[in-house]
Amino acid sequence: MFFFACFLAVQSSWAQQAQLYSPMKDFTLYDRKGNEHKVSEFKGKYIVLLFTSQDCEPCKEAKSILDGFYNRNKDKAEVIAISADDKDTWQKETTNVSFNEWSDNNSAKDIGSYYGLNLCPLFVIIHPNGNILHISKARLGGFFKDLNENVPDAEIEKILNSHKK
Protein backbone atom coordinates (compact mmCIF):
# COMPACT_ATOMS: atom_id res chain seq x y z
CA MET A 1 0.00 0.00 0.00
CA PHE A 2 2.86 2.40 0.84
CA PHE A 3 4.42 1.85 -2.61
CA PHE A 4 1.10 2.59 -4.32
CA ALA A 5 0.67 5.84 -2.35
CA CYS A 6 4.22 6.94 -3.26
CA PHE A 7 3.58 6.12 -6.91
CA LEU A 8 0.42 8.24 -6.90
CA ALA A 9 2.26 11.14 -5.26
CA VAL A 10 5.02 11.01 -7.89
CA GLN A 11 2.53 10.58 -10.70
CA SER A 12 0.52 13.63 -9.57
CA SER A 13 3.68 15.77 -9.35
CA TRP A 14 4.60 14.75 -12.91
CA ALA A 15 1.11 15.75 -14.02
CA GLN A 16 1.80 19.23 -12.66
CA GLN A 17 4.84 19.75 -14.92
CA ALA A 18 4.47 21.75 -18.10
CA GLN A 19 4.26 19.79 -21.33
CA LEU A 20 5.07 21.17 -24.77
CA TYR A 21 2.02 22.12 -26.84
CA SER A 22 -0.24 21.98 -23.79
CA PRO A 23 -2.03 25.03 -22.35
CA MET A 24 0.05 27.19 -20.05
CA LYS A 25 -0.86 27.30 -16.39
CA ASP A 26 -1.56 30.79 -15.12
CA PHE A 27 0.24 32.10 -12.06
CA THR A 28 -0.08 35.21 -9.91
CA LEU A 29 3.07 37.30 -10.01
CA TYR A 30 4.01 40.75 -8.69
CA ASP A 31 5.89 43.72 -10.07
CA ARG A 32 8.34 45.71 -7.94
CA LYS A 33 5.54 48.02 -6.75
CA GLY A 34 3.58 45.02 -5.45
CA ASN A 35 0.92 45.12 -8.18
CA GLU A 36 -0.56 41.72 -9.00
CA HIS A 37 -0.27 40.32 -12.53
CA LYS A 38 -1.04 37.13 -14.41
CA VAL A 39 0.78 35.77 -17.44
CA SER A 40 -2.62 35.41 -19.15
CA GLU A 41 -2.83 39.22 -19.37
CA PHE A 42 -0.85 38.83 -22.58
CA LYS A 43 -2.75 35.95 -24.18
CA GLY A 44 -3.08 36.81 -27.86
CA LYS A 45 0.64 37.65 -28.12
CA TYR A 46 3.71 35.46 -27.99
CA ILE A 47 4.94 35.38 -24.40
CA VAL A 48 8.59 34.83 -23.54
CA LEU A 49 9.29 33.86 -19.94
CA LEU A 50 12.86 34.25 -18.74
CA PHE A 51 13.58 32.76 -15.32
CA THR A 52 16.52 34.69 -13.98
CA SER A 53 18.69 35.25 -10.95
CA GLN A 54 20.73 38.29 -9.97
CA ASP A 55 24.04 36.38 -9.94
CA CYS A 56 23.48 34.62 -13.28
CA GLU A 57 25.78 35.97 -16.03
CA PRO A 58 23.97 34.20 -18.93
CA CYS A 59 20.74 35.72 -17.56
CA LYS A 60 22.22 39.21 -17.89
CA GLU A 61 23.23 38.50 -21.49
CA ALA A 62 19.77 37.10 -22.26
CA LYS A 63 18.08 40.14 -20.66
CA SER A 64 20.14 42.49 -22.82
CA ILE A 65 19.28 40.64 -26.04
CA LEU A 66 15.62 40.23 -25.06
CA ASP A 67 15.32 43.93 -24.26
CA GLY A 68 16.15 44.80 -27.87
CA PHE A 69 13.89 42.00 -29.12
CA TYR A 70 11.01 43.29 -26.99
CA ASN A 71 11.42 46.87 -28.20
CA ARG A 72 11.33 45.72 -31.83
CA ASN A 73 8.42 43.28 -31.38
CA LYS A 74 6.21 44.57 -28.56
CA ASP A 75 3.22 44.63 -30.90
CA LYS A 76 3.29 40.82 -31.14
CA ALA A 77 5.38 39.59 -28.19
CA GLU A 78 5.75 40.20 -24.47
CA VAL A 79 8.79 39.36 -22.39
CA ILE A 80 8.49 38.63 -18.69
CA ALA A 81 11.56 38.08 -16.54
CA ILE A 82 10.63 36.03 -13.48
CA SER A 83 13.04 36.24 -10.58
CA ALA A 84 14.18 33.04 -8.89
CA ASP A 85 15.72 35.15 -6.12
CA ASP A 86 14.09 35.75 -2.77
CA LYS A 87 11.87 38.84 -2.60
CA ASP A 88 14.42 41.07 -0.80
CA THR A 89 17.24 40.26 -3.23
CA TRP A 90 14.94 40.83 -6.21
CA GLN A 91 13.66 44.15 -4.82
CA LYS A 92 17.24 45.42 -4.42
CA GLU A 93 18.25 44.43 -7.96
CA THR A 94 18.54 47.35 -10.35
CA THR A 95 17.91 46.70 -14.01
CA ASN A 96 17.43 48.80 -17.06
CA VAL A 97 15.09 46.79 -19.28
CA SER A 98 11.83 47.86 -20.84
CA PHE A 99 9.99 44.54 -20.45
CA ASN A 100 8.17 43.23 -17.38
CA GLU A 101 10.12 41.91 -14.40
CA TRP A 102 7.96 40.01 -11.95
CA SER A 103 8.30 37.76 -8.92
CA ASP A 104 6.00 35.39 -7.08
CA ASN A 105 7.64 36.62 -3.84
CA ASN A 106 8.62 33.00 -3.18
CA SER A 107 11.83 32.48 -5.21
CA ALA A 108 9.72 31.24 -8.17
CA LYS A 109 9.03 27.96 -6.36
CA ASP A 110 5.58 27.20 -7.81
CA ILE A 111 5.94 28.56 -11.33
CA GLY A 112 9.56 27.40 -11.49
CA SER A 113 8.60 23.90 -10.42
CA TYR A 114 5.87 23.82 -13.07
CA TYR A 115 8.35 24.66 -15.83
CA GLY A 116 11.13 22.46 -14.42
CA LEU A 117 13.40 25.24 -13.15
CA ASN A 118 16.58 23.89 -11.62
CA LEU A 119 19.08 26.23 -13.28
CA CYS A 120 18.90 29.80 -14.57
CA PRO A 121 18.32 30.93 -17.16
CA LEU A 122 15.22 28.98 -18.12
CA PHE A 123 13.34 30.08 -21.22
CA VAL A 124 9.70 29.42 -22.10
CA ILE A 125 7.89 30.51 -25.26
CA ILE A 126 4.09 30.55 -25.18
CA HIS A 127 2.01 30.79 -28.37
CA PRO A 128 -0.67 33.53 -28.62
CA ASN A 129 -3.28 30.77 -28.14
CA GLY A 130 -1.77 30.02 -24.70
CA ASN A 131 -0.01 26.76 -25.57
CA ILE A 132 3.61 26.13 -24.55
CA LEU A 133 5.92 26.03 -27.59
CA HIS A 134 9.38 25.84 -26.07
CA ILE A 135 11.12 25.17 -22.76
CA SER A 136 14.90 25.24 -22.57
CA LYS A 137 17.37 25.37 -19.73
CA ALA A 138 20.49 27.52 -19.93
CA ARG A 139 20.90 27.15 -23.70
CA LEU A 140 20.90 30.63 -25.22
CA GLY A 141 21.48 29.42 -28.79
CA GLY A 142 18.66 26.88 -28.84
CA PHE A 143 16.25 29.31 -27.26
CA PHE A 144 17.03 32.14 -29.68
CA LYS A 145 16.71 29.75 -32.64
CA ASP A 146 13.23 28.68 -31.51
CA LEU A 147 12.28 32.27 -30.71
CA ASN A 148 13.34 33.42 -34.18
CA GLU A 149 11.34 30.61 -35.81
CA ASN A 150 8.18 31.80 -34.02
CA VAL A 151 8.76 35.56 -34.01
CA PRO A 152 11.24 36.31 -36.82
CA ASP A 153 13.63 39.10 -35.86
CA ALA A 154 16.58 40.35 -37.95
CA GLU A 155 18.79 41.07 -34.93
CA ILE A 156 18.22 37.61 -33.43
CA GLU A 157 19.01 36.18 -36.88
CA LYS A 158 22.34 38.06 -36.86
CA ILE A 159 23.19 36.64 -33.43
CA LEU A 160 22.37 33.12 -34.60
CA ASN A 161 24.44 33.54 -37.77
CA SER A 162 27.43 34.90 -35.84
CA HIS A 163 27.45 31.74 -33.70
CA LYS A 164 27.48 29.51 -36.80
CA LYS A 165 30.83 30.92 -37.95
State what each model feature region is:
Residues 1-19:
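Bacterial Sec-dependent N-terminal signal peptides
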Residues 13-39, 152-164:
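N-terminal "domain-start" segment that seeds a small globular fold
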Residues 24-25, 46, 120-121:
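Short loop/turn microsegments at loop-to-beta-strand junctions
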Residues 39-60:
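Short active-site neighborhood of thiol/selenol oxidoreductases, capturing the structured segment around
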Residues 48-49, 79, 123:
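Hydrophobic beta-strand anchors of alpha/beta hydrolase catalytic cores
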Residues 60-97, 107-113:
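Structural microenvironment flanking redox-active thiols in thiol-disulfide oxidoreductases
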Residues 94-129:
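Short, internal strand/loop/helix patches
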Residues 125-165:
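Thiol-/selenol-based redox modules, centered on thioredoxin-like
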